[in-house]
Amino acid sequence: MIVVNANLLVQYYVRGTHTAVAEAVLSRDAQWIAPMLWRSEFRNALILLVRRRLVPLEDAVVVAHEAERLMAGHEHIVVAHRVLRLAADSGCSAYDCEYVALAEDLDVPLVTSDRQVVRAFPSVALTPERFLAA
């Protein structure tokens, strides 16, 4: 079981230079979990791609449904005080710290391409490449 952030989900579902790595992460550990926040972040990333004309709106809707199916039953609520403490101590956003808090609470790795999170939380956050090499 691993915590994944919305960026990794976007990399998995939207074909691009990082898709193969995201697919390898899923092959290595298919039990992906995330805080409930992932949905909003994922949708926001998709609409940004739509606005840049990189993904048609219809495709974004399909991708959103596919991601929701993958993550169904694997979404967790994290408590505010943990998230806020992590954000205050690290300088990372509260959004990012939702993923960190979940990973720490469940004692599982957080796989993310967010270098700031990896630097701030080296004991729990791994890049996809480092996760695959471990």
What role is predicted for each listed range?
Residues 39-43, 80, 117-118:
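Alpha-helix N-cap/helix-start and coil->helix boundary motif
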Residues 48-49, 86, 102, 120:
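Residues within well-ordered alpha helices
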Residues 1-37, 49-58, 116, 134:
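Short, well-structured N-terminal submotif of metal-dependent ribonuclease cores
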Residues 69-113:
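Active-site neighborhoods of divalent-metal-dependent phosphate/nucleic-acid chemistry enzymes
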Residues 7, 41, 98-101, 116:
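Active-site phosphate/pyrophosphate-handling residues
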Residues 43-71, 82:
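Active-site-proximal, substrate-binding regions of enzyme catalytic domains
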Residues 1, 92, 100-134:
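Acidic, PIN/NYN-like endoribonuclease modules and their adjacent C-terminal/linker elements
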